[in-house]
Amino acid sequence: MLLQYIQSPKLLSFIHVINRFYRSNFYILFIGLLTVLSEIFGWELPVYYLYVILGGVIPLFFCEDMISIIAPFSFGYFTVSLKHQNVNEGVGVTLFTSEFMIHLWILIALIALCFITRFIFDYKKGKRIHASKNMLGFLILALTFITGGLFTEKYGIHSVLFGLGVVASFAIPYFSAYFLVDFEKEKKDYFARVLVGAGFVLIAEVLFAYFSHFDAILDGTFSGEMVRTGWGVKNNVGAMMVFTLPAPIYLALKHKRPFFYLGLNLLFFLSTMICQSRNAALVAVIGEMILLVYFFIKTKYRLLSLVTILFFVLLFVACAFLFSNLVSKMFDSLIWTLQNFSIEILASGRFDVYQCALDNFKTSPIFGTSFIEEPVGIGAPPDYFLTDIIPARYHDTYLQLLSSTGIIGLIGYLYHRYVTLVPFFQHKTSEKWLYFFEILVMIGVSVFDCHFFNIGPGIIYGLALCHLDQVNQIDQKERYLFSFEKAMN
């Protein structure tokens, strides 16, 4: 913001260094390091202050845009430490004490002030914002969510707030990036690099979870339930890991030597398996096959890429063989699931919950029964919603929509899905494929779980939608200018 008023060459040179830093891998890695430290040591509050200073305050005064918000948005969900989780008392987080909430509201006010100030400044400089069809999609989705359970006894402010919160989880990062990031200056691979950074953050946190229970691994009592962080259990961590799979494939196609990124993709795939989430594993297997087919169709280095994949596969197999006793103890439940695979095992006794969702839908097919109607089999206490904010759910996004919001909510979701996919089909590019795969991941992980209603997936999803929209607008503009120049010549 102060860039245009500075005349000193030395100071201008320093500010240009700051701008390059925010677009570099070093910034992404630094935010990732802060995130891991927060999750391991319980340093959420100081890390949040650093997030706001680095992502909002400094860029407000010294940067061309606020690309600095992409990494903190993407990693912020992973900061909550297990130290602040009431593991012995059931679901609930002790992080949000009254003292912490005072700091949190200060931080929210500060970052909101930075965002609004930047938006006004950019607008006065002449920046114009083009309307997006996603804006209408978000509005319709929000309206259908807040009417979920209308005319039923469970309908109330808690259900309304939860519905708005779901839409806000991807609308806030979407609009923040949409209004504050200059996508014409953003390198096309920037978001992919952020997703790779997210992959490393998740791997570090999963490894910490394993090492925290190393005694259980050695004595054979380790289970997938021990793969948990302060912000989620194995299903949450596994789902977020799946979101990182497309990025290395995109980067492999963008670089002349794709072999490093192929290795990263396989590492992220293996890490998804290590999370021991059956839902995430299923989506990862299907998604990985689709990604590799896409890669081999597009790449010029098919033979070398195949050799690279075989090398990493053999490396993983050799490591598993060398440490077979340890591996069998760590993944006993996952190995058993693979050996005895069936839909019933995959669903993990959720059919009663699914039937409950269908029964609720039948009782109120138009507006549903609200988000706070408790599913059978969850075992949530009466005050579950008030103590944990997020209500018990049906482990299936689409049944959740029918049960909680009825036909109206399903229509709102389908319209939202339509407008999110339209930009992809308008002149496909490699960047659009990346964001399209991110949307497919959200659809996939939501089949046997409710990740569409979770904050972390919502943030990545919202940023992917924003990038898809902006890339489409830039692509249309470039093709129009090319056609115009061609016609003039």
Please name every model-derived segment:
Residues 146-149, 171-172, 189-217, 231-297, ...:
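Alpha-helical transmembrane segments of multi-pass inner-membrane proteins
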Residues 222-228, 306, 320-356, 376-379:
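Flexible juxtamembrane loops connecting transmembrane helices in multi-pass membrane enzymes
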Residues 341-405:
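Long extracytoplasmic/lumenal interhelical loops at the membrane interface
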